[in-house]
Amino acid sequence: MVVVTKKTMKIQIHLLYSFLFLCFSTLTLSSEPRNPEVEALISIRNNLHDPHGALNNWDEFSVDPCSWAMITCSPDNLVIGLGAPSQSLSGGLSESIGNLTNLRQVSLQNNNISGKIPPELGFLPKLQTLDLSNNRFSGDIPVSIDQLSSLQYLRLNNNSLSGPFPASLSQIPHLSFLDLSYNNLSGPVPKFPARTFNVAGNPLICRSNPPEICSGSINASPLSVSLSSSSGRRSNRLAIALSVSLGSVVILVLALGSFCWYRKKQRRLLILNLNDKQEEGLQGLGNLRSFTFRELHVYTDGFSSKNILGAGGFGNVYRGKLGDGTMVAVKRLKDINGTSGDSQFRMELEMISLAVHKNLLRLIGYCATSGERLLVYPYMPNGSVASKLKSKPALDWNMRKRIAIGAARGLLYLHEQCDPKIIHRDVKAANILLDECFEAVVGDFGLAKLLNHADSHVTTAVRGTVGHIAPEYLSTGQSSEKTDVFGFGILLLELITGLRALEFGKTVSQKGAMLEWVRKLHEEMKVEELLDRELGTNYDKIEVGEMLQVALLCTQYLPAHRPKMSEVVLMLEGDGLAERWAASHNHSHFYHANISFKTISSLSTTSVSRLDAHCNDPTYQMFGSSAFDDDDDHQPLDSFAMELSGPR
């Protein structure tokens, strides 16, 4: 018989508690809490059918979704953007999207997503852009959407939404763009605060007055036609004669039209056949897809003018739709007789295809025939920074700062991480594109000259845009990385002012040279006079001042005094700006150093007349007289005047 004492029992109970505590602690430590954003995104993915694997790298065991495709995160690693347009997604949109409370943009347009729009979207207080257009959503528009107090851009067009017109949308305070066209909504349309809204294609809606025609039905009385026999045979004969004559004319017109159409089609087929033979030396370029001219002709509707996205110095860019539904941008190069030969063109294509960075426009394909050169890029649904600066709603300050940093990182990659390095030579707002999540993407670098490590510059014909061209490039045709840095500085001024460089120059034409005037306002701490009025008071004054300082550093007259793009990125991110700004004051050219009377009097009459002639020179108008003053180069004023006279 076993006798259990009190002491033994206490020891056993203590051991039991210790064992249970150890098991609980082990379970707690071994099961790391899951990120609620990961759970929400996985639920969204599981509700969708993804035929092209666009969401394949969404890992349910991951704790950080910021590296996933189609996801944009804030600097604090919070999910702020979900963008998967034109991915052929189907299925339903999970209500778990309401758990992504930091979302600012949702872009799921041009898919086949069906079912009801989840009311949980109303739980996203920071949402600014919601685009569910061109899907198969049905049912009512959830009333909870009126709770999106930050919403500015709403597109639900081209779905199968029904029910009464959502009058509650008029209560969203900041809504500036609304498109509900081509659905099955009914009832009266209230007044909206949105600057732009579209309700076309909803057959059962009507204006708010008068209400009696808003029942959603159309009453039509039958059409009655009476024929009187009293008109006699003469009227019948006349009618028959007119009918025969009219029919003959119609048949003749149709015959002529058919003949012209046939001739035009044969001519087009002949052109297609002539252009459809790929150059033998340009076939099979790595990962680049080779298109035939006939394919691109079909994808762009015959290079229709309605599909033109933009026109530049290298040619037109057309919107295209591939056979699988993917949207692309097709650049059709002009003046190909002046382009390099097959070997040089092949080398440039290969180098461009290796320049892969999230802030660079990726080349995905090409077409090269004896008469055509075409490049195929991904379609950027939000256009260019230049167009967004002119559209409504205006880009907010945080977005402008994000664009500046993204563009700077793209140029840094071209300058310091490509081998051989690539010079863009036309950095401007029109060449900075915005993807579905408003991430800055540098475009048109694919047509830049490649810079060999053995060279410090490339001498060639001047290419670029007036107002963005660096002075040394304009005067000598010599470009370098610092040429791009100058253009980037002008881009920063465009982001600050909301104006193109030429528009900005006209604005300040009565106040002196553009950059000289900017520096003066900065010295006098009147930065607000430069700011885009569309920003209102929604900006950080310190950040604006810092960006302006970076712009002024980038646009210094001498290339050697401008920072490298790696330094520009650090300064925009808040590192090293103060030191660089202080060091810049050691350059006598940076601020006003007016030409002394002694210097001018020592010039010959010819030299003075040369200097006077530059009052109308573009470089003089940009830099002012301070551009002529520099002790570092020890060059006479005459040589500077010669440099500023433009390309020879």
UniProtKB/Swiss-Prot annotation:
Q: Where is the active site?
A: 426 (proton acceptor)
Residues bearing PTM Phosphoserine: 384, 387, 475, 480
For the modification Phosphotyrosine, which residues carry it?
473
**Ranges of residues in domain Protein kinase:** 303-582
Q: Which domain of life is it from?
A: Eukaryota
Note the Gene3D superfamilies from the entry.
Phosphorylase Kinase, domain 1, Ribonuclease Inhibitor, Transferase(Phosphotransferase) domain 1
Extent of the LRR repeats:
100-125, 127-148, 149-172, 174-199
Q: Where does ATP bind?
A: 309-317, 331
The region annotated as signal peptide is 1-30
Cross-referenced SUPFAM superfamilies = L domain-like, Protein kinase-like (PK-like)
Q: What reaction does this catalyse?
A: L-seryl-[protein] + ATP = O-phospho-L-seryl-[protein] + ADP + H(+); L-threonyl-[protein] + ATP = O-phospho-L-threonyl-[protein] + ADP + H(+)
Q: Give the Gene Ontology MF terms in alphabetical order.
A: ATP binding; coreceptor activity; identical protein binding; protein serine kinase activity; protein serine/threonine kinase activity; protein tyrosine kinase activity
Q: Which residues lie on this side of the membrane: Extracellular?
A: 31-238
Instruction: Look up the record and give one Gene Ontology term from the biological process aspect.
Output: leaf senescence
Which intervals lie on the Cytoplasmic side per UniProt? 260-648
The protein here is known as Probable LRR receptor-like serine/threonine-protein kinase At4g30520
